[in-house]
Each structure stands twice: as C-alpha cells, then as structure tokens.
Amino acid sequence: MPPARSKARKRALDVLFEAELRGLPVLDLLAERITLGSPPVAPYAADLVRGVMVHKARIDELIGEYAEGWTLDRMPAVDRNVLRIGIYELLWADDIPDGVAISEAVLLARDLSTDASPAFINGLLARIAELKPSLELESPLDPDPSPDPDPSPEPAEVPAPVPGATPEP
C-alpha cells in the first residue's frame, strides 16, 4: 500500500485533472469531493489542491518558462497537473524535501502518463529545484496572500510646534 502522502498526491491530481477536463472550478470540485467523501480526500490532498490554486499563475509561468519545446496547452493534461503539484511542493511546501517532491511527481507520471513523461517531469522539476534560491515566488498575477486588512492611507505626520517659533502665513 502506498504511503498516505503518495495517495494524497494522487487524489490531488485526480481533482485537478477532473476539473480541467470537465471545465469546472477546481475549488468547487474539491469542496464537492470532500463533502461526498467517496473516495475520501485526505487533508494533505486538499492542501495540495488549494496551494496549487493559490500559486497557479506563478506555477504556470515557471512551467512555460522552463519547459523547453512545450507550451502548457500542448502538454498532456496529466503532465501539466503533475508539474503543478511538484512545483508547489518544491517552492511552497517547506516540510517536503526537494528530492521527495521530484521523485513522487516522477512516480505519478510513470503510472499515469506517457513513456516520455517521467524523464521530462524529472528534468523540469530538477531545474526548478536548482533555480529555487533565485526564483521570485510571487507573480504579479497571483493574489497577494496577505492583503493589508486596512487599505486606508496612513495619516500624514504633522510636525510638533517648535516653542518660540512663529507660524508661517
């Protein structure tokens, strides 16, 4: 039996893939799957789906930039979503070692995609891991993960009066 996190990655892939295939909002489908509970959606699977969606613009930007010879649209849907999960784990899941994120993505590709997919996914994720220290993680297209709760401007500071000075007209 595969470890719990491996099963959770597979379940997250199922949700991302199904939503894309059926043209459904991912988070709505995730909520439906959690409610139905058959098959169950582990908390880590839900975290992966939500994390991918929060950072999707930046993740897709990175795939487009580093997937030599492939555009997102031309790539098999399974590969595209395996890469999204792998990149999310590499860049934002601090408790997952890079090697684990890469090898788990390669295993998913080996089980579910084309013969060429594992090598392609391994190469792309290894490149992202190598560049990780220099990558800007937030895209201008991503929503600010921590918006300012009070968007009102700061009041201008008024200098304190100086004793003995006359006010300017």
Where is each model-derived feature located?
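N-terminal interaction/assembly modules
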Residues: M1-P169
